[in-house]
From Swiss-Prot:
Cytoplasm recorded as keyword: yes
Catalytic activity: ATP + H2O + a folded polypeptide = ADP + phosphate + an unfolded polypeptide
Assembly information from the UniProt record: Forms a cylinder of 14 subunits composed of two heptameric rings stacked back-to-back. Interacts with the co-chaperonin GroES.
Induction conditions: By stress conditions e.g. heat shock.
Sorted UniProt keywords: ATP-binding, Chaperone, Cytoplasm, Isomerase, Nucleotide-binding, Stress response
EC number from the UniProt entry: 5.6.1.7
PROSITE patterns (UniProt xref): CHAPERONINS_CPN60
Localization, UniProt: Cytoplasm
Role of this protein: Together with its co-chaperonin GroES, plays an essential role in assisting protein folding. The GroEL-GroES system forms a nano-cage that allows encapsulation of the non-native substrate proteins and provides a physical environment optimized to promote and accelerate protein folding.
UniProt-recorded name of the protein: Chaperonin GroEL 2
GO BP, sorted A to Z: chaperone cofactor-dependent protein refolding; protein refolding; response to heat
Length: 552
């Protein structure tokens, strides 16, 4: 397929046009008074959203050269979302401002390479400044971060704070669509295993169709058990201890299963069994997780352990075990969760997570960390209409991601104030730059950092330039509260941003801007010409009557 090629100013102008087209559609969604964007869908009703990344992903421009610019900004938004979970609109606005000011200077004769180098140096300095001013998240700040990121919805803020309190920062919190009108929080405390009881004859509560054990012992093995003789020693020891027994094995069948069911029915031993979760190497790893959490050992021939020699101190223990048809929940004591073994295991899993390139593996590792650390919470989102439901779900996902980012790297004053304070520190840093063009780059960044606050104010119907000047005159945590329309202490007012979100937005915007400024040629696919329309066939004259063809 043939290509379109453009060079120098022409190529950069095309990129800028595409960047502006996408950024102008995204920027209006910024802040608690951000406007909505209606997205037409090929199938179904249009979607009304107030989420920058969703708008960015939908945009495809007809001009291939301009579309290349739009794709670059999509990359900024996607990368920021991937790293910090929020801040996509802020990153887009900063990138647009950097490109606009940068290209203006390149057109005036500035060296693009020197500008890029200056942008990189200043960005590195500003990232260090963000780390220096960030404060750890404490108490009500978690709810405040979530409230701000959800479009100022206090109910969502309180719900996310409650979920994080219950499952800890290592727990898994997921967002699902509910069939009801209400948004609710469900928390599964303890380790959930996606396997249920092997036989319904183990059920202890026939009304609820589940098995409930208090203070059970847990036998964990990767073996398939079919002969009861292997289990007799451990069953006798558990019977003497007078406690329930939960068996987790690859499978239990035949004579072994029948004997366990009979003993349970006769009241000789309170016992139940489930199959080991997962498959292959992951199964061994999950069994080891269960063993570490419950203080037991995995009985495996791989390490020289056999079932007929198991002692009570090799069995795990839990405060409670609940077995349903399809899943099991083990609640370990607080002392077990706080043990050195669990902490070491979580640390090891974090290293595996960092080293993994597979999204699937990362998801599974994160689930394992959550089950060891605290549990799993599900926020079920409800709304009156499908359109409102999707918008609300996007807001809650943003809020959840922002909250996790805040816990990781701390918080800074929100409302674009931190960016204004950073811009004020650039002047003193300029002395460390090598030449005038790098200092021009510093001025470009300083101006670009004002753009998010300017847009926040504009979306609220206020003159952005006036608000920017007022915030510049203020000090410390004083900034513009869009809700009240006043300059006040934003930390005290709960208007806070995760430091990770601000950092990621700045770094990703600077990266793309540097690339655009140093682009000298643009090579894109030439669009295929539209296929000619079919000619009008008219009424196919001359076919009427068809004389002489009469039927006898």
């Amino acid at each position: 397929m043939s290509k379109l090629i453009s060079f120098k100013d022409e190529s950069r102008r095309s990129l800028e046009a595409g960047i502006n087209a996408l950024a102008d559609a995204v920027r209006i969604t910024l802040g608690p008074k951000g406007r909505n964007v209606l997205l037409e869908k090929q199938y179904g009703a249009p979607q009304i959203v107030n989420d920058g990344i969703t708008v960015a992903k939908e945009i495809e421009l007809s001009n291939p050269e301009e579309n290349a610019g739009a794709k670059l900004i999509q990359e900024v938004a996607s990368k920021t979302k991937e790293i910090a979970g929020d801040g996509t609109t802020t990153a887009t606005i900063i990138a647009q401002a950097l490109v606009r000011e940068g290209l203006r200077n390149v057109a005036a004769g500035a060296n693009p390479v020197a500008l890029r180098r200056g942008i990189e140096k200043v960005t590195t300095f500003l990232v260090q400044e963000i780390e220096a001013v960030a404060k750890p998240v404490e108490g009500s700040a978690i709810a405040q971060v979530a409230t701000v990121s959800s479009g100022n919805d206090p109910e969502v803020g309180a719900m996310i704070a409650d979920a994080m309190d219950k499952v800890t920062k290592d727990g898994v919190i997921t967002v699902e669509e509910s069939k009801s009108l209400n948004t609710e929080l469900e928390v599964v405390e303890g380790m959930q295993i996606d396997r249920g009881y092997i036989s319904p004859y183990f059920i202890t509560d026939s009304d609820r169709q589940l098995v409930e054990f208090d203070n059970p012992l847990i036998l964990i093995t990767d073996k398939k058990i079919s002969a009861i003789a292997e289990l007799v020693p451990v069953l006798e020891a558990v019977a003497r201890a007078g406690r329930p027994l939960l068996i987790i094995a690859e499978d239990i069948e035949g004579e072994a299963l029948a004997t366990l069911v009979v003993n349970k029915a006769r009241g000789v031993l309170n016992v139940a069994a489930i199959k080991a979760p997962a498959f292959g190497d992951r199964r061994k790893a999950v069994l080891q997780d269960i063993a570490i959490l419950t203080g037991g050992s995995v009985i495996s021939e791989d390490i020289g352990l056999s079932l007929d020699t198991v002692s009570l101190d090799q069995l795990g223990q839990a405060v409670k075990a609940t077995l349903e048809k399809d899943n099991t929940i083990l609640v370990a004591g607080a002392d077990k969760r706080a043990s050195a073994g669990v902490k070491e295991r979580i640390e090891q899993l974090r290293k595996e997570y960092a080293a993994s390139d597979s999204d699937y593996d990362k998801e599974k590792i994160q689930e394992r960390i959550a089950k060891l650390a605290g549990g799993v919470a599900v926020i079920k989102v409800g709304a009156a209409t499908e359109t409102e439901l999707k918008d609300r779900k996007l807001r809650i996902e943003d809020a959840l991601n922002a909250t996790k980012a805040a816990v990781e790297e701390g918080i800074v004053p929100g409302g674009g104030t931190t960016l204004i304070r950073l811009a004020g520190k650039i002047e003193s840093f300029k002395a460390q730059l090598s030449n005038d063009e790098e200092r021009v780059a510093a001025d470009i960044i300083a101006k670009a950092l004002e753009a998010p606050l300017h847009q926040l104010a504009s979306n609220a119907g206020v003159e952005g330039s006036v608000i920017v000047e007022k915030v510049k005159e203020a000090t410390g945590n004083q900034g513009y509260n869009v809700i009240t329309g006043k300059i006040e202490d934003l930390i005290a007012a709960g208007i806070i941003d995760p430091a990770k979100v601000v950092r990621s937005a700045l770094q990703n915007a600077a990266s793309i801007a540097g690339m655009v400024l140093t682009t000298e040629a643009l090579v894109v696919e030439k669009p295929e010409p539209a296929a000619p329309a079919m000619p009008d066939m008219g009424g196919m004259g001359g076919m009427g009557g068809m004389g002489g063809m009469g039927m006898m």
